[in-house]
Amino acid sequence: MAYWVKISYERKEYVVNFERVSAFCYEQNGRVTFWLPDCAIPIVINPQSNQQDYQKILKYIQYITEAQLENSYWVKIYYERNEYVINLNCISSFCYEPPNGRITFWLPDGIIPIIINPVSNPESYEKVVNHIQKTTGHFLS
């Protein structure tokens, strides 16, 4: 079932199926960014200038992180002082670097690489490793 939301951004109105959005990013200044499905266009919502749409996004993020949704594996990952909420089932490739153990993956509807380090971000790293093992059957070593 689709989860359609109307968002106002830069004097335009977008109607977006949030079930097709693969990642959201909370920034330290309170802004929330997501990328339109099937393209790399970021939508950045500021709570000071667009409180109504900001609340819609927060409500959806709360819903997806609390519910056990079929065909999704939503996780919170802290990366470069931002909190990303990512559906790992939408990620189609992972790159593992044996010397230091880092894992890199790219957000499907964005161009941003996410690099997870086992030393500096052990909780997020473990979530990604577990997902890779469960989904692909491959073990990183």
What do these predicted ranges mean?
Residues 2-14, 19-84, 89-141:
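Acidic, Ser/Thr- and proline-rich intrinsically disordered linker/docking segments
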